[in-house]
Swiss-Prot record:
Cellular location(s): Nucleus
Keyword Metal-binding belongs to the record: yes
Residue ranges, annotated region (Disordered): 271-291
Keywords: Activator, DNA-binding, Metal-binding, Nucleus, Transcription, Transcription regulation, Zinc, Zinc-finger
Full protein name: Putative GATA transcription factor 13
Function (record text): Transcriptional activator that specifically binds 5'-GATA-3' or 5'-GAT-3' motifs within gene promoters. May be involved in the regulation of some light-responsive genes.
Family to which this protein belongs: Belongs to the type IV zinc-finger family. Class A subfamily.
Highest rank taxon of the organism: Eukaryota
A GO MF label: DNA-binding transcription factor activity
Species of the source: Arabidopsis thaliana
Name of encoding gene: GATA13
SMART domains from the UniProt entry: ZnF_GATA
Length: 291
């Protein structure tokens, strides 16, 4: 074996010595004299340009035959290779096969059709539909809604901070508002009805002393003209059952009773004096004239 051959010697183990002699048949050699030369080189170039190369599908569909030791070996069509196999993989498969199969695999890997297939498979983009379907099934259904990116989140945070700072009240304004609220609370606590001295009422009404000076019950009585001293709501802290009442009829009855007691007391006071007693003693005696 010559050193110019780039094929390793291990691939030719088990092959006869005249294997390469049979491949290179001297009877098929063409001499240089048989080649016609002429001035019509331009015509040949024009003719070759008009030729259309055969499609790759037809070349791939053809089967190839060659002779080895007087036997005809046919190379069958193989599956298209997606990835270009390295020389180490090819030679490893050749070592583990019989001699005839070794030759077929070797020539198949070195044939121009296999080179075209490898270049076609490596250069052309593969159809990733199957891989995409598998990945889709594995990963699961994903929504079409766009995921918020980091830039959006940071922009929203900065925007919200600016808006909150713009609409947030200043410290002076907040202190003034708190002071007004405290004053209102203090005023509501200090309010007291001038008639019954109550501090809890659903609504403050106008009285003789101005606005919000009477409670709700006393204010209604004042507007109707029936607010008297004896009237007190039952919830008033100054309510006395023997003196006050929240019913107008009872107040009138109490006044009539007080008037009657006042008249009897006045009569008793007048009759209990010394002059009235002397008059009652002398009443019915005959009077003497000319004494």
């Amino acid at each position: 074996m010559n050193n110019d051959l780039w094929l390793p010697e291990e691939d030719f183990k088990g092959l006869p010595d005249n294997f390469l002699d049979n491949l290179v048949d001297p009877t098929n050699d063409v001499s240089v004299e048989d080649i016609e030369t002429g001035d019509d080189e331009g015509d040949w170039d024009a003719k070759f340009q008009k030729l259309v190369p055969p499609p790759l599908d037809e070349l791939m569909s053809l089967s190839y035959e060659f002779t080895c030791n007087g036997q005809r070996v046919q190379v069958q069509k193989h599956v298209p290779i997606l990835k270009q196999s390295s020389s180490s993989e090819v030679f490893s498969t050749v070592d583990n096969s019989p001699p005839n199969v070794k030759v077929s695999k070797l020539l198949q890997s070195l044939s121009p059709v296999s080179v075209l297939k490898n270049t076609n498979g490596s250069g052309s983009p593969q159809n990733p539909n199957g891989d995409q379907k598998l990945a889709f099934l594995v990963k699961g259904i994903r929504s079409k809604r766009k995921r918020p990116t980091l830039l959006r989140v940071t922009f929203l945070k900065s925007f919200l901070l600016e808006m909150s700072q713009q609409f947030a009240p200043d410290e002076s304004e907040s202190s003034e508002i708190s002071a007004l609220k405290k004053r209102k609370k203090n005023k509501s606590r200090r309010l007291k009805c001038t008639h019954c001295e109550t501090t809890t009422t659903p609504q403050w009404r106008e009285g003789p002393n101005g606005r919000k000076t009477l409670c709700n019950a006393c204010g209604i009585r004042f507007r109707s003209g029936r607010l008297v001293l004896e009237y007190r709501p039952a919830a008033s802290p100054t309510f006395i059952p023997t003196v006050h009442s929240n019913l107008h009829k009872k107040i009138i009855y109490m006044r009539m009773k007080d008037n009657d007691q006042f008249d009897t007391r006045k009569i008793r006071a007048e009759t209990s004096g010394p002059e009235t007693r002397s008059r009652l003693r002398n009443f019915g005696r005959p009077m003497s004239y000319g004494q």
